[in-house]
Amino acid sequence: MRYHGGIRRTHMVTIMKFEHLIEINDPLNPLIDALSIKQLWSGLVLRAESPKLFVPHLDDCVIDERTENSFRRRLRYGELVIEDRVLLEPMRQVRYEVAAQQDISASSLTMTIETPTEDTLFVRFQYQDGHDAATDAANAMYDDFRRSAYVESDIDTIGMLRELASQGRLDAMLN
C-alpha cells in the first residue's frame, strides 16, 4: 500500500484530506487470487447497499430516494442516526457524501477503481472531513487516529470482498 495524505486550509475551513491505495491484483504475487473489475465493482456497491456486512456495530440501514446512480441511506448506530447519499459512477467510483447534521460536520469518502496496467487493479480511498477553524485544534489530535481507523476499515473491506469473491457471491451479483 502507498499512502498520501495531508491537511489543506482554505477560507477558514480546515479540510482533513487523506487518501491511500490498496492493491487488489498483483501479477507478481501468485498467492493472491485476482479479482475482475466487475467483481470489485459489485463488491464496492454491496458495501454501500449492505453496510452491515462490513460494519459490525451498525444497527440498521434504510435505503430510499434511489435513482439510477445514487441513493440515500439512514444509518443507525444505537441512538445516533447518520444520513448520507451514495453516488455511483458505474465500474469506476462509489462516493459517500455526508451533509452536516447535528454534531457531525460534512464529510465524504470516495472509492475509485484504478487500472494503471492491464494486470493491476487498485482502489484509491479518499477521505475529506471539513470542520471550522474553531474545532480544528480539538480535532487535530484525533486525525492520526482517524486515518489509522480508515486504513484498517478499508483493508477489512477488501478482505471481505476477497472472501465473498472466493465464495462466488460477487459473481452471483453480476448475473
Show which residues each predicted segment covers:
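N-terminal amphipathic/basic-hydrophobic helices that include classical n-h-c signal peptides
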Residues: 1-12
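Glycine-rich portal/gate segments that line the openings of hydrophobic small-molecule binding cavities
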Residues: 63-102
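Hydrophobic residues positioned within well-ordered beta-strands of beta-sheet architectures
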Residues: 18-20, 71-73, 84, 96, ...
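Hydrophobic/aromatic beta-strand elements that line small-molecule binding cavities or substrate pockets
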Residues: 58-62, 82-87, 107-115
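Beta-strand elements of well-folded, non-transmembrane domains
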Residues: 24-26, 77-79, 127-131
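Hydrophobic ligand-binding cavity/cleft-lining segments
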Residues: 11-62
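A conserved amphipathic terminal alpha-helix motif
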Residues: 138-175
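Beta-strand/loop substructures that line and gate deep hydrophobic ligand-binding cavities in soluble
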Residues: 101-152
